[in-house]
């Protein structure tokens, strides 16, 4: 008899995901694992996959990014948001670029620092930088 997973034992079928019915969570994609003492294998390949997944999921500045930044600050984290890694959609009465600008100005005013990806020292995928904070908040 072959071994079974817990899910198989209780009768749960394998899950499937599409970008319309799931949430992407990038867990612990930190530079320590790419270049530090805890170096993992196949970093370049996993970064490509993470970047591809992230480009398909996207996010919104006025909800996801601002809420994560605010919560991170409330929990005592030093919050950094990468400006050129954030976008949004237009909402009634506000164009997308204006919404991003206002949401990030609110972050800068009270909850954290907004930087450009070019300001990050070392080799890192800038868009993933923001998602490190999400992982810490979960």
Curated annotation (Swiss-Prot):
It catalyses: [(1'E)-5'-(3',3'-dimethyloxiran-2'-yl)-3'-hydroxy-3'-methylpent-1'-en-1'-yl]-quinolinone B = yaequinolone C. Pathway: Secondary metabolite biosynthesis; Alkaloid biosynthesis; Mycotoxin biosynthesis. Gene3D superfamilies: Isochorismatase-like. The keyword Repressor does not apply. Keywords: Hydrolase. The keyword NADP does not apply. InterPro entries: Isochorismatase-like_dom (IPR000868), Isochorismatase-like_sf (IPR036380). It is an enzyme of class 3 (hydrolase). It comes from the Eukaryota. Isochorismatase-like protein; part of the gene cluster that mediates the biosynthesis of the aspoquinolone mycotoxins. Within the pathway, asqB converts [(1'E)-5'-(3',3'-dimethyloxiran-2'-yl)-3'-hydroxy-3'-methylpent-1'-en-1'-yl]-quinolinone B into yaequinolone C. The first step of the pathway is catalyzed by the nonribosomal peptide synthetase asqK that condenses anthranilic acid and O-methyl-L-tyrosine to produce 4'-methoxycyclopeptin. 4'-methoxycyclopeptin is then converted to 4'-methoxydehydrocyclopeptin by the ketoglutarate-dependent dioxygenase asqJ. This is Isochorismatase-like protein asqB. The gene is asqB.
């Amino acid at each position: 008899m072959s071994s079974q997973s817990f899910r198989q034992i209780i009768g749960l079928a394998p899950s499937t995901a599409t970008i319309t019915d799931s949430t992407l969570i990038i867990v612990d994609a930190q530079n320590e694992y790419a270049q530090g003492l805890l170096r993992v294998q196949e970093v370049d390949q996993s970064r490509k996959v993470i970047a591809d997944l992230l480009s398909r999921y996207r996010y919104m500045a006025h909800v996801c990014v601002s809420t994560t930044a605010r919560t991170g600050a409330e929990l005592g984290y030093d919050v950094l948001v990468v400006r050129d890694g954030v976008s949004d959609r237009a909402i009634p009465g506000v164009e997308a670029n204006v919404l991003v600008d206002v949401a990030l100005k609110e972050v800068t005013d009270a909850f954290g620092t907004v930087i450009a990806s070019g300001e990050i020292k070392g080799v890192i995928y800038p868009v993933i930088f923001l998602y490190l904070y999400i992982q810490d908040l979960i």
